[in-house]
Design a protein with these regions (language model features):
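Non-catalytic accessory segments flanking P-loop/AAA+ NTPase cores
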Residues: 1-479
Length: 479
């Protein structure tokens, strides 16, 4: 994938075209918004503070690509991304999720993204250390002597609280194992080199060994009180205290392959600087984060029905988040001034003007997405990367069944999906999933005992779907 900083808006649209059919206006809008972020980063710091993202409101029926455009844009930009539904939130003071949780979710997404990147950077070093651990277990006589350092604070807490922390079923300390005679240095090196080569080649993968695994200390139930940790102000105190508790070690009997994975994970945790991860994640979420608010039309006050306190209250709670505010997360404070908000809704029962005026003003860019036509469906079936028909062909090929899907069959599938959408409920491209599942049901059930090659043409499509599509009552339940 090319560097996002090298992509012009036209090239960003071309990248989105790889996965999404049509909707050129929406793609143009998000491409310009993404490019403006890069343009802003090149400006003086004083001017950067005054340039805020122009939030986008997408209007269009379900299944036309609103969510997919935002998701692919975030993937393309390497930006933290969360998708939330406006209907899940309630006004402050009512039972339910408060709107600030969407910002906390963004912080979590950024932490996962940066942590995964750091894991990739230390993967080789962690794997090397894991192999050395395994050699210590396989050949303890070659393990260099080490002094056992302890955490005095953890030891004090452990002695005060005893088994209140960590594993409640922990076994009492066992007497120390007898000391293993050390091999001469040159002999130790030879043994370790040979063992390292054998482990790398996978010779020991299925061999069972006994290892000690650290178990995170857990605070007793009720010690920190109730409540959702994600809603705690000033950070997760229980997580902080758990880090101060003495680590419990449990013995497990696992294969060498599993031990290598377990040790590598432990080493990654030691090599990654989580403070640096948090700082970078919060910076990235604040500067590049994208929050996609779906079903925003469901919290609009419908015309002629009067004010709805709950709906309008949620809008007013969302307003300061979109305007730019600072939210406290368990990782630190996150400012939303430069987070890009993309809202979307079908607006069947309401209009964008039914949103409160202040919220309307925070989404200055409005794009209307078009309903999909039969020609669009044909393109969706065949053109995008890993298109639907390619997926079904690959799945059946795994069972040795070769599919030959003729062009007239593709046209028939698109026509039937369009007719059902027009007659019943328009669910956009999602209709193709239900149609294709019905079409390939018999072939998928018969494989792999069926014929090794199956041809799908227009008569076959009509045979499988024609009667159901023509019968409105049946199609309501099946398609």
């Amino acid at each position: 994938m090319p560097d996002i900083q090298e992509l012009t808006p036209r090239q960003i649209v071309a990248e989105l075209d790889t996965y999404i059919v049509g909707q050129h206006k929406a793609k143009r809008a998000v491409a310009i918004a993404l490019r403006n972020r890069y343009r802003r980063e090149k400006l003086p710091a004083e001017m950067q503070r005054d340039i805020i993202p122009k939030n986008i409101l997408m209007i269009g029926p379900t299944g036309v690509g609103k969510t997919e455009i935002a998701r692919r844009l975030a993937s393309l930009a390497g930006a933290p991304f969360v998708k939330v539904e406006a209907t899940k939130y309630t006004e402050v003071g009512y039972v339910g999720r408060d709107v600030e949780s969407m910002v906390r979710d963004l912080a979590e997404a950024a932490i996962r993204m940066v942590r995964d990147e750091r894991r990739g950077e230390v993967k080789d070093a962690a794997d090397h250390a894991a192999v050395e651990h395994i050699i210590d277990v396989l050949h303890p006589e070659t393990k260099p002597p080490q002094s056992s350092a302890t955490n005095p604070f953890a030891s004090t807490l452990g002695s005060i609280f005893g088994n209140s922390f960590g594993n409640q079923n922990a076994q009492p300390a066992q007497p120390a194992a007898p000391t293993v005679a050390q091999a001469p240095p040159h002999e130790s090196q030879r043994i370790r080199d040979e063992a390292r080569t054998d482990i790398e080649r996978g010779f020991y993968d299925v061999r069972l060994i006994e290892i000690e695994v650290e178990e995170a200390a857990q605070l007793p139930m009720g010690m920190m009180g109730g409540g959702d940790p994600s809603q705690m102000q000033g950070g997760d105190m229980s997580e902080m205290l758990a880090g101060l508790m003495p680590k419990k070690k449990a013995k497990k009997r696992v294969t060498v392959a599993d031990a290598r994975r377990i040790f590598a994970q432990e080493e990654e945790g030691k090599l990654i600087d989580m403070d640096a991860v948090k700082r970078e994640a919060l910076r990235r979420a604040g500067e590049r984060g994208i929050i996609f608010i779906d079903e925003i039309d469901k919290i609009a006050t419908r015309e002629g029905r009067g004010a709805d306190v709950s709906r309008e209250g949620v809008q007013r709670d969302i307003l300061p988040i979109v305007e730019g505010s600072t939210v406290t997360t368990k990782y630190g404070t996150l400012a939303t001034d430069h987070v890009l908000f993309i809202a979307a809704g079908a607006f069947h029962m309401s209009k964008p003007s039914d949103l409160i005026p202040e919220l309307q003003g925070r989404f200055p860019i409005r794009v209307e997405l078009d309903s999909l036509t039969a020609a669009d469906f044909e393109t969706i079936l065949t053109q995008p990367k890993n298109a639907l028909l390619m997926q079904y062909t690959a799945l059946l090929a795994a069972d040795g069944v070769s599919l030959d899907i003729r062009p007239d069959a593709i046209a028939a599938i698109a026509r039937i999906a369009t007719e059902v959408n027009e007659r019943d409920e328009n669910i956009g491209a999602r209709r193709l999933h239900t149609v294709l599942e019905r079409l390939f049901e018999e072939i998928g059930y018969a494989a792999p005992e069926s014929a090794p090659a199956v041809t799908i043409d227009a008569p076959y499509v009509v045979e499988r779907l024609g009667e159901i599509a023509a019968n409105a009552d049946l199609s309501n339940f099946i398609l």
